[in-house]
Amino acid sequence: MYSLIRKALFSMEAETAHYFSIQALKLMGKLPFSLCSTTLNPVEVMGLKFKNPIGLAAGADKNGEAIDGFAKLGFGFIEVGTVTPLAQDGNNKPRQFRILEAEGIINRNGFNNQGVDVLVENVKKASYDGILGINIGKNATTPIENALDDYQICLHKVYSYADYITVNISSPNTHNLRALQYGEALDHLLAELKTEQAKLAKKFNQYKPLVLKIAPDLTNEEIVSIADSLIRHQMDGVIAGNTTLSRENIAGFNHAHQQGGLSGKPLHTLSTKLISTLAKELKGKIPIIGSGGVHSIDSGQQKIDAGAHLLQLYSAMIYQGPTLIQELAKKIILR
């Protein structure tokens, strides 16, 4: 069945195909039944109870338009966004490119989204009752020295509607954003956001975990430094990781020269190495959500064995269809 759908989608430019997929999922979300049952393989992470450890990665549903549709595909949790305080168009099109030979995707979207207020309204309208993460970022026009303001605005607005909030400082498509991953800049950001989290937890009488999403393009020394900051600031989780700027695994393939972040199967080895190094430093103190290149039972299990507590995918679903979600949920063996 999906092979026919894929053939139709792959006849379109990548971003057009994504648009039609979101529209179809919006319609699917209105159906009184699910096309796929949600496999129960429960796990508790960050104080949250997940139906299974397989989640939708951020980037698939930036505005939270199709939450109920994605829920019918069997995910154990869903992460929407990245969302910014103000709506923005992102970078010029075309900005998404399939690397067919390697089952990868390069994007330079640049946080295109309709703004945090629109996302919140969409979340409020959704009937999904599973774990929902909301991924927050900064506007392209906001100077990097004022980035904290954007994260605080988004944190305040989404806090009541998310089960956990992800702070995205690792997209390669927003100028200078990755600079927030290092040293004093990271310490300042985390300290201020944890202070806000404490205030919001008291205000709403509910603690919502705060997660950091980091890049796979880090040296061992940088990973050690980030892990130290995560522990000192008592972050609740970390997503390892975002898209990569490396083209090592797709050299010579069509579109490999395009600028942007690479996701999908070619990212698997790099992201798994990131998880492994991070896990050694965190020593179980902070849970890891493994993201980047999950494309099979074996690749997912490798990430769990490296130290991940949960998994996220998106690109593999484009290439293989939603059956991979149930297969992973049934067969992944948690540590």
UniProtKB/Swiss-Prot annotation:
<keyword id="KW-0285">Flavoprotein</keyword>
<feature type="binding site">
    <location>
        <position position="168"/>
    </location>
    <ligand>
        <name>FMN</name>
    </ligand>
</feature>
<dbReference type="GO" id="GO:0006207">
    <property type="term" value="P:'de novo' pyrimidine nucleobase biosynthetic process"/>
</dbReference>
<dbReference type="GO" id="GO:0044205">
    <property type="term" value="P:'de novo' UMP biosynthetic process"/>
</dbReference>
<feature type="active site" description="Nucleophile">
    <location>
        <position position="171"/>
    </location>
</feature>
<keyword id="KW-1003">Cell membrane</keyword>
<feature type="binding site">
    <location>
        <position position="168"/>
    </location>
    <ligand>
        <name>substrate</name>
    </ligand>
</feature>
<comment type="similarity">
    <text>Belongs to the dihydroorotate dehydrogenase family. Type 2 subfamily.</text>
</comment>
<feature type="binding site">
    <location>
        <position position="173"/>
    </location>
    <ligand>
        <name>substrate</name>
    </ligand>
</feature>
<feature type="binding site">
    <location>
        <position position="293"/>
    </location>
    <ligand>
        <name>FMN</name>
    </ligand>
</feature>
<protein>
    <recommendedName>
        <fullName>Dihydroorotate dehydrogenase (quinone)</fullName>
        <ecNumber>1.3.5.2</ecNumber>
    </recommendedName>
</protein>
<feature type="binding site">
    <location>
        <begin position="58"/>
        <end position="62"/>
    </location>
    <ligand>
        <name>FMN</name>
    </ligand>
</feature>
<keyword id="KW-0560">Oxidoreductase</keyword>
<feature type="binding site">
    <location>
        <position position="264"/>
    </location>
    <ligand>
        <name>FMN</name>
    </ligand>
</feature>
<dbReference type="GO" id="GO:0005737">
    <property type="term" value="C:cytoplasm"/>
</dbReference>
<dbReference type="GO" id="GO:0005886">
    <property type="term" value="C:plasma membrane"/>
</dbReference>
<dbReference type="GO" id="GO:0106430">
    <property type="term" value="F:dihydroorotate dehydrogenase (quinone) activity"/>
</dbReference>
<feature type="binding site">
    <location>
        <position position="82"/>
    </location>
    <ligand>
        <name>FMN</name>
    </ligand>
</feature>
<feature type="binding site">
    <location>
        <position position="241"/>
    </location>
    <ligand>
        <name>FMN</name>
    </ligand>
</feature>
<dbReference type="InterPro" id="IPR005720">
    <property type="entry name" value="Dihydroorotate_DH_cat"/>
</dbReference>
<feature type="binding site">
    <location>
        <position position="62"/>
    </location>
    <ligand>
        <name>substrate</name>
    </ligand>
</feature>
<keyword id="KW-0288">FMN</keyword>
<dbReference type="InterPro" id="IPR005719">
    <property type="entry name" value="Dihydroorotate_DH_2"/>
</dbReference>
<comment type="subunit">
    <text>Monomer.</text>
</comment>
<feature type="binding site">
    <location>
        <position position="135"/>
    </location>
    <ligand>
        <name>FMN</name>
    </ligand>
</feature>
<keyword id="KW-0665">Pyrimidine biosynthesis</keyword>
<comment type="pathway">
    <text>Pyrimidine metabolism; UMP biosynthesis via de novo pathway; orotate from (S)-dihydroorotate (quinone route): step 1/1.</text>
</comment>
<feature type="binding site">
    <location>
        <begin position="314"/>
        <end position="315"/>
    </location>
    <ligand>
        <name>FMN</name>
    </ligand>
</feature>
<dbReference type="Pfam" id="PF01180">
    <property type="entry name" value="DHO_dh"/>
</dbReference>
<feature type="binding site">
    <location>
        <begin position="107"/>
        <end position="111"/>
    </location>
    <ligand>
        <name>substrate</name>
    </ligand>
</feature>
<dbReference type="InterPro" id="IPR013785">
    <property type="entry name" value="Aldolase_TIM"/>
</dbReference>
<feature type="binding site">
    <location>
        <position position="213"/>
    </location>
    <ligand>
        <name>FMN</name>
    </ligand>
</feature>
<dbReference type="InterPro" id="IPR001295">
    <property type="entry name" value="Dihydroorotate_DH_CS"/>
</dbReference>
<feature type="binding site">
    <location>
        <begin position="242"/>
        <end position="243"/>
    </location>
    <ligand>
        <name>substrate</name>
    </ligand>
</feature>
<comment type="function">
    <text>Catalyzes the conversion of dihydroorotate to orotate with quinone as electron acceptor.</text>
</comment>
<dbReference type="InterPro" id="IPR050074">
    <property type="entry name" value="DHO_dehydrogenase"/>
</dbReference>
<dbReference type="InterPro" id="IPR012135">
    <property type="entry name" value="Dihydroorotate_DH_1_2"/>
</dbReference>
<keyword id="KW-0472">Membrane</keyword>
